[in-house]
Amino acid sequence: MVPMGLTVLSGPSGVGKDTVVAAVRERHPEVWVSVSATTRPPRPGETDGVEYHFVDAEEFARMVKAGEFVEHAMFAGHAYGTPRRPLLERLAAGVPCLLEIELLGARQVRSAMPQARFVFLAPPTFDELVRRLTGRGTESPEVIARRLDRARIELAAETEFDDVIVNDDVRSAAARLVALMIGS
């Protein structure tokens, strides 16, 4: 893989971002995927430094004040941010980097790093997105309703992105993302 630098992947909750990124990493372990910091508590099975860097609100605020994030935003009542130093180190070393972040974070990265490639992952249909979110069985109807309200806003913003990938098949979506990352 010839690295093109930084690729930012965004899309609504339930569209399959984690699954597509995992498929990319499975075939291309040389792609570095940023580990975000968050104030949300770890879920069962999550390990600090693997899925997220888990920090308390005070530490997160300190990191924001110190300029340690490329982007940061509130989502679902918790703060999330992309640590600046590891990203810049990998980019300087020529490592292809992938950020999987939400819309507000993507907008911040576009302001700070406009040379990045911005990719929006979209569901085949809104009904399919509803099916995926409800099929998880992990969230209350109220949380799902909030996520769907947010998804409508995010879907309306897809024109802000350089490319749109419809995730109707994980392997195809991952292959398309890799093709965009290497510029083919």
Swiss-Prot record:
Cited Gene3D superfamilies: Guanylate Kinase phosphate binding domain, P-loop containing nucleotide triphosphate hydrolases
Cross-referenced InterPro entries: GK/Ca_channel_bsu, Guanylate_kin-like_dom, Guanylate_kinase, Guanylate_kinase_CS, P-loop_NTPase
EC number: 2.7.4.8
GO cellular component, one term: cytosol
Pfam families (UniProt xref): Guanylate_kin
CDD domains: GMPK (cd00071)
Entry binding sites for ATP: 11-18
PROSITE patterns: GUANYLATE_KINASE_1, GUANYLATE_KINASE_2
Record NCBIfam families: guanyl_kin
Protein purpose: Essential for recycling GMP and indirectly, cGMP.
Family: Belongs to the guanylate kinase family.
Protein name stated in the entry: Guanylate kinase
The species this protein was found in: Frankia casuarinae (strain DSM 45818 / CECT 9043 / HFP020203 / CcI3)
Lineage of the organism: Bacteria, Bacillati, Actinomycetota, Actinomycetes, Frankiales
This protein's encoding gene: gmk
